[in-house]
Design a protein with these regions (language model features):
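PLP-dependent amino-acid enzyme catalytic core
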Residues: 1-421
Length: 421
């Protein structure tokens, strides 16, 4: 079991992780809590499976079967194409030839294996996860293979993301919000369900295990490169992964063996839904006002989060500000070009979000926002799915129930209770 305490970014209160803590006991409100680990220098434990080799900086009390870890390597193909001398790619997905064994094809597995191994006194209840698709697929795999009761809430339009190599354990149930809904609607549904005593929220960005699981991408990169990178590139839907990268970076500064710089967070959003980009470029901590109907439609198109952890203390605005980072807006055409470029130069298929990150790196080079001799970490958040599906027959999980957006909360509660009888 990892030795750590939780700490509030707002008031500095330190407290034990006893009851699936998601907030400071002082109820600071708009602030993230974080894990303060007793071991300040990271020891990579190669004798532990997958992700858990980084357990010194993961809030876990056990290991689970089946995890894979991010894999970092120095690029030759893409780096040569872009004229970069020190480009390192951190690959999350399925690419056995590189040692990447995430069978859902995305770094959401890093979150799921960390969250499900966290101290939990609620094991007799059902964890609820709201997702736009990839996170749900990852949690479904982890919980199915480790017999952990789980209820997933996703927009029905994202149902194609719910594939797996084999049928899911009956302990995993799936409910969806009707077509035309988005991730925020799935979150709203999950909140209604969590009013029932039988269910508890996974927590999203507020869950320290989710963020520190994501942060293993940086642990992989820094321990492979031997120093903290100068720049960090990633596409973001909610910004949680970039927040996690910032937090991991600061732990390495305390570690003292890898440098004392903060890598500049260079994060990107996919046009047309760019609320964080718009706020950042306007110099605003608060997200800018937008018509709810327009936001719903745009977010639905790319399965994005209308209410990201951008403004709160310790959120993406603070991370970008402290690191001197920047944001990019990338079109679908640019993202597709990024996907094609990566597969041509590196030899593996990547997901659209990763294509957005590649496109943002191209844009940054073109505009002179980064130096060609800088040490750059490119976080490929998903890849190898086409390869996995070619090598394996997959099955799709259909919703156990689909709810209209105007469904009465009591009806929702009665329906989901029946799923776990």
């Amino acid at each position: 079991m990892t030795d750590y305490v939780l700490e509030s970014r707002c008031c500095g209160t330190k407290f034990a992780d006893e009851k699936w803590e998601l907030d400071c006991p002082n109820r600071d409100g708009a602030a993230l809590i974080f894990a303060n680990y007793a071991k300040k220098q990271l020891e990579v434990k190669e004798n532990l499976p997958g992700l858990y080799k980084y357990s010194d900086w993961l809030p876990v009390c056990r290991t689970l079967d089946g995890s894979g870890a991010p894999v970092t390597y120095k690029s030759e193909g893409l780096a040569g194409e872009l004229g970069l001398s020190d480009l390192y790619i951190t690959f999350n997905g399925y690419w056995p030839e590189k040692g990447a064994l995430m069978k859902t094809g995305a770094f959401k597995e890093c979150e799921a294996y960390a969250v499900c191994a966290r101290i939990n006194d609620l094991n007799d209840k059902v964890m609820v996860v709201a997702s736009a698709g990839n996170t749900a697929r990852a949690f479904a795999r982890v919980c199915s293979e480790n017999n952990i009761p789980l209820l997933l809430c996703i927009p029905q339009d994202c149902i194609d993301a719910m594939w797996s190599a084999k049928p899911l354990n009956p302990c995993v149930k799936l409910v969806a919000t009707e077509r035309g809904s988005d991730y925020f609607d799935a979150i709203y549904l999950s909140n209604i369900i969590c009013e029932l005593d039988k269910f508890y929220p996974e927590g999203g960005a507020k869950n320290v295990a989710r963020r520190d699981g994501m942060g293993t991408t940086v642990l992989s990169a820094v321990t492979t490169i031997g120093r903290i990178p100068d720049y960090y590139f990633q596409a973001v839907g909610s910004g949680t992964g970039a927040i996690a990268a910032w937090e991991a970076n600061k732990r390495f500064i305390v570690d003292g063996r890898y440098g004392n710089n903060l890598m500049k967070l260079m994060v990107s959003q996919n046009i047309p839904f760019t609320p964080m980009y718009d706020a950042w470029k306007a110099g605003s901590r608060a997200l800018l006002p937008v018509d709810d109907t327009v936001a719903r439609k745009q977010a639905e198109e790319i399965c994005a989060n209308r209410k990201p952890p951008y403004s709160l203390k310790g959120g993406l605005f603070d991370a970008l500000t402290e690191t001197g980072g920047d944001m990019f807006a990338i079109s679908n055409e640019e993202a597709m070009e990024g996907m094609v470029l990566f597969e041509r130069t590196e030899g593996i298929d990547i997901e659209p979000a990763a294509g957005v990150a590649v496109a943002s790196l191209k844009q940054a080079i073109r505009t002179g926002a980064v130096e060609t001799d800088a040490v750059i970490m490119l976080n490929i958040t998903g890849g190898g799915i086409a390869k996995f599906k070619k090598e394996n027959k997959v099955v799709y999980k259909q919703p156990d129930c689909v709810f209209a957006l105007d469904t009465d909360p009591d009806t929702i509660k009665e329906t989901v209770m029946e799923l776990f009888i």
